[in-house]
Amino acid sequence: MRFSDNLAKILDKYENLGNKLSSGIMGDEFVKASKEYAELEDVVAKIKEYNKAKSELEEANNFKLEVGLDNATLEMIEDEIYTLENSLPKLERAVKIALLPKDDADSKSAIIEVRAGSGGEEAALFAAVLFNMYQRYAELKGWRFEILAISDTGIGGYKEASASIKGKDVFSKLKFESGVHRVQRVPETESQGRIHTSAATVAVLPEAEEVDIKIEDKDLRIDTYRASGAGGQHVNTTDSAVRITHIPTGITVALQDEKSQHKNKAKALKILRARIYEEERRKKEQERADSRRGQVGSGNRSERIRTYNFPQGRVSDHRINLTLYKIDEVVKNGQLDEFVEALIADDEAKKLLEI
């Protein structure tokens, strides 16, 4: 089907849905039609803008052929033609991007997990830096950042930390952060001034609701035990810590941050649900498009995606060859938008090649 025919078909569908909604339908039929109509609004607006520019270009070209036009009028028409011809490719690209298959998870909130990797205590300190960076970014975006669990080293580092980030389209912005983040810097304890390299792993999961993932009680094994602090000593006398295992998948979540067993269980279930949902998403994505495995956003957690070089003051994203020489703004202030927007644009460009 030609591109123009496809656009006409979408406009017809949108008009038919509008007529259907105006006809007084009710119940499930109304809900379904309303949802479809709302989903088409954005792409229809872009199609109409594209068609309008095409129509205006055709009119301008026809007008230019008329006999007896003075030079001033002819120059004005040629300027208009030039402007329209330059705008059409951009408008067409906007339509194609709007037509790309949507990731159902993009509109969801997210759970972010940061774990210290290779590099000992320096890796744990870097994990804490990353976790705080995402907290700053969430604040800049007006999202709600709720710490779920932190396992600290006692001297400022995090063995692992997780948080729930709530807001509109959070997952669509943060999903490209999944992977291995590497840091190069001189540790405070390094007397010779040598640069050390360490790493931390980031996992970003769409926060799943109960309607997304139904977890049966019979599929869960719940163990309770006493919470322990640094060095392994017990920090309370009740079995407040919780370990939940999802038997069908083998996915396990353990939490002991809260003094209440009930609160630990609720948080653990939230993380568990997100991990199961993400696992199902990954399987479906692989089945649907094996050809996209190596592309940005594959979510490969073993892939080294970004390096933070403190002596040089730079942050480099290896997937899109983007380097910014403003490490403090990125790390301390959470100014991640340049990376986020570039990664989204790159992902869209690669998807467009598949159309």
From Swiss-Prot:
UniProt modification remark: Methylated by PrmC. Methylation increases the termination efficiency of RF1.
N5-methylglutamine modifications at: 233
Compositional bias (Basic and acidic residues): 280-293
Keyword Cytoplasm: yes
Entry's Gene Ontology cellular component terms: cytoplasm
Signal peptide: none
InterPro entries: PCRF, Pep_chain_release_fac_I, Pep_chain_release_fac_I_sf, Prokaryotic/Mito_RF, RF-1
Keyword terms, alphabetized: Cytoplasm, Methylation, Protein biosynthesis
Single GO MF descriptor: translation release factor activity, codon specific
Annotated spans, Disordered: 280-306
Protein's cellular compartments: Cytoplasm
Matching NCBIfam families: prfA, PRK00591.1
General function of this protein: Peptide chain release factor 1 directs the termination of translation in response to the peptide chain termination codons UAG and UAA.
The family this protein is said to belong to: Belongs to the prokaryotic/mitochondrial release factor family.
UniProt name for this protein: Peptide chain release factor 1
Species for this entry: Rickettsia africae (strain ESF-5)
